[in-house]
């Protein structure tokens, strides 16, 4: 099976708001089926990618950072006109999963993914207008997990002490 690998631009805090190369980075991710997130498991680079003393940076923060930026990106797409969208779905008695999948088709979200997410999160599948901001945020996170599964590649694992970070990351991010 052929695989296309693409190295995408760096990410900075606030990328989902368009800061740095954020929009370019997120647009590059739009077509990805899987992400391979290469982290410095030895914690020898800081948030800016600058070399620092090994084991002084928590590589789990790098994982959380990428997940957060992607979750906020998904949420911003869902939230565009959400109230009007939710009312329209209710008034037209449209199937919620079909409507949301259509809105997020550019992210490769399918109707089945939306249905599974709604069920998993125990959201009201009949009345979208009852969903809270937290419900919509949880949906964004779940859809991101389904459409952009992430493999963590532990770089610099040969540096003494990196094995402890590796074990901790495996516990914190089991999937």
Put a short name on every predicted segment.
Residues 57-129:
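Non-catalytic, alpha-helical, charged scaffold/linker segments
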Residues 43-44, 73, 159-160:
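Short, acidic Gly/Pro/Ser/Thr-rich loop/turn segments
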Residues 36-37, 175:
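Short hydrophobic alpha-helical runs that function as membrane-insertion/retention elements
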Residues 37-40, 152-155:
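Conserved beta-strand segments of the P-loop GTPase G domain that flank and frequently precede/overlap
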Residues 2-36, 42-65, 130-142:
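Switch II of P-loop NTPase G domains
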Residues 77, 87, 129, 149-151, ...:
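Canonical P-loop GTPase G-domain recognition
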Residues 114-150:
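Alpha-helix-centered segments that form part of catalytic cores
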């Amino acid at each position: 099976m052929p695989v296309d690998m693409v190295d995408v631009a760096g990410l900075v805090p606030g990328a989902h708001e368009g800061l740095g190369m954020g929009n370019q980075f997120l647009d590059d991710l739009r077509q990805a089926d899987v992400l391979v997130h290469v982290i410095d498991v030895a914690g020898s680079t800081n948030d800016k990618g600058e070399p620092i003393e090994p084991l002084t940076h928590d590589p789990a923060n790098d994982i959380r950072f990428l997940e957060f930026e992607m979750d906020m990106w998904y949420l911003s797409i869902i939230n565009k006109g959400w109230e009007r969208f939710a009312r329209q779905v209710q008034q037209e008695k449209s199937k919620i999963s079909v409507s949301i999948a259509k809105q997020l088709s550019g992210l490769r979200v399918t109707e089945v993914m939306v249905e599974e997410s709604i069920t998993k999160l125990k959201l009201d599948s009949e009345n979208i207008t009852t969903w809270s901001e937290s419900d919509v945020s949880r949906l964004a996170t779940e859809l991101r997990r389904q459409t952009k599964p992430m493999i963590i590649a532990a770089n610099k694992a040969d540096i003494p002490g990196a094995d402890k970070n590796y074990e901790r990351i495996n516990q914190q991010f089991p999937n």
